C-alpha cells in the first residue's frame, strides 16, 4: 500500500495467499507501419513504435524478507518509455552477385528506472538509465546454376548507456508523500561515467542443393566487438574502478548437411561454433538480491561455444502427419557465471567477502570465466490431422548440464516441459484446448550464483524449525480458446485459461502465473 505518493508505516496482512497484491500495471503501445512501393518492385517500409508504462511494482522484492520482516516498503520500476524508428529498403537487382537485398536501419531510445525504499526507512533510492541503440543491417543473396546459392551481409550496432542514481528523504504529511529532500549520490546500476558497446560483423553463407536427396551448407561470420565503461570516483563501491576497455574479435563457422532418403524423411546434422563478448550488463552491473551483491568485474573475457546438432523430420505424403526430433550437445569454453568476488579496497567490514551497501552488510559476487561446461538435450514436436476438422499437436523439451564439483550446477537450465493441444476448425469457428506441463527441479540442481532464483520457490519447514527452499514443483495448466470470424474485418476471441485454477510458478520466475482467467478480445480491421 506504499507507493510513489502514498505512505503507510505498518504492515498490512494479505488474507488471501493466492492473491498477489501490487502486481497490476498499465501500458500504452502505439504501432504504425508505412509501406511505399518504389519503381522496379522495390519496397520501402517505415516502422514506428512507442510504448509507455505506469509504475510497475516488483512483487518478488516486495515479499523479500530479512530477519523475519519485510525488507522493502517500496520497490518498483518507474514508467518505461520506449521509442523505435526503423526504415527498411527491400530491393531487387539483376547483378550476378546481387539478386535481392534488404537494408534496415533502427534507432531505439529507452528510459527506465528502479526505485526502492526499505521498511521503516524514509530514504528512497532511485536508479535511472537512458539507453540509445543504433543498428544497421544489410542482407543480400544471389543464386547460380546447378543449385548453388550465396547469401552475405553486414551488421553494425552501437549501444550507449547513461546511468544515474541518488537517494532522497521522503517528507510525510499524514499518509501522503508531500515532498522530497535534496539528492545524495549513491552507487549507480551501470558504470556511473557512461558506457558503450559496439559491434561490427560480416558473414557469408553458401548453400548447395546437389540433388533431391542432399543439401550442403557452409557459412562463416567475422565479428568485432568493443566495450567502454567509466566510473566516477564519487559514490563508488570499489575505489579501483576507473575505466575498462574490452575489444574482441572471433571467426565463427557453421557446417550442415541435409539428407532426404525418401519423400517422407529428412535427416539433418549441424556443426557450429559461437562467440559472446561480455556486454555492459555482464561487466558493469551492480545489483543486490537477498543479501547478495553482484559487482563489476573488469577482467571478464569472452566465452565460446561449440555445438553439434542432429535431427530427423517425418512428414506423410498427404502432409497430414508431421514429427520432428532434435538433439544437441554444446561445449562452452570460458563459461561466464557468477562466483565469489573480493573487493580488496573496501574496509567497511572486517570480512573481505562482504561490504556495506545501502547500510546493509552484503556478500559480493561477480561474473567470472570459470572453465569449460557441457550442455545437452533434445526436443520432440509434431502434429496429426485426425480428420479434416480436428488437429492434434504435441511437443516436449529437455535440457541438462554438467555439474561441476567446484562451481556447482549450471544456471538457467529449466526442467523438462511440453504441451499437448487439440484444435477443431469448422467454417468460421476454431476451438482449441491446450494442456501445458513442466517437471520439477530440485534445490540441489540450482546454480550457486543465484541466477535461478531459488529463494522464490516454496518454503519447507523442517522438524527442527529450519527453513528450506523446495525448488520448483511440477505443474500443469489447462486452457480453452475460441475464435469466431464474424466477418473478414471483425473477429471475436474468447478464452478461459488455467481452468483448474492451479497455483504455480514457472522456473526462475519471481511471480506466480495467473489463476483462472476469462479473456475476451475483438479484432477490427478498419
Task: Set out the residue ranges of the language-model regions.
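Repeated loop/turn-to-beta-strand initiation elements of outer-membrane beta-barrel proteins
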Residues: 41-44, 94-101, 111, 147-150, ...
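Signature of Gram-negative outer-membrane beta-barrel scaffolds
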Residues: 151-262, 277, 287-290
